[in-house]
């Protein structure tokens, strides 16, 4: 099936080189926020299938703690849109032994969107595999060969991957993998456009960015008569979040630089959480939170 060629996210996790300097003091990756019709069932799924644990965000909100970041859930009345038409493609965990990890998932009843697939040729790394899980509310979750089994990456799509990557470097202190300046030349794998691309690091999370042109080839039905991304808000993966030690300063710096602020600073959970929202490249919703992610 076409999406079985959508794999370079796995390769990027191991094939990264040197990094470019940060342009601003770094933020920290804070969370992935999902919409779901059944938060309790979703939490059961993630904590039983992957290396993560139940925890209460701010001591009050049931969620999933995955090493250094949160997975948070909003309950919605009907199934959230899950077609790959926004700039958030998927997120995923690593596996030291992909064959064993895949079989364990199969034996436990996990449904797969894409079965175990060998992409050693692409990765130039013998025994390199990936698979896509059909998660709660049809969230797409990748398992891929890695040197760990933690929550490891978020894979995005962009009309300009290089510019998008530079935006995350500038505003969130993400570190770009690669020795040479990023290439803007198109690159293809088995007919699918996978470049230009960017691979960035924010704490434990590898942020990988592929070109928008990948999506219509991999998901033609969803992209029929479509030219642009849907906003991520309201979809199964609603947004991602980054934290700053001083949210007010960070938000004002971004605002002065022309970043669109979509929600001003608010507080929640008896003022224990301070947050705001901005719009990032390709209509991605990004939450800014004060204070680094931690398990209560």
Short names for language-model regions:
Residues 47-51, 96-97, 103-110, 169, ...:
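Sec-exported extracytoplasmic/periplasmic mature domains
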Residues 8-18:
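Bacterial N-terminal signal peptides
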Residues 24, 30-71, 76, 121-127, ...:
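Core segments of cupin and vicinal oxygen chelate
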Residues 73-79, 141-144, 209-220, 288-289:
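Amphipathic N-proximal alpha-helical interface segments
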Residues 27-37, 62-65, 80-157, 178-201, 242, ...:
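Vicinal oxygen chelate
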Residues 20-22:
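Terminal presequence/propeptide segments associated with secretion/organelle targeting
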Residues 1-6:
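N-terminal secretory signal peptides that target proteins for export/translocation
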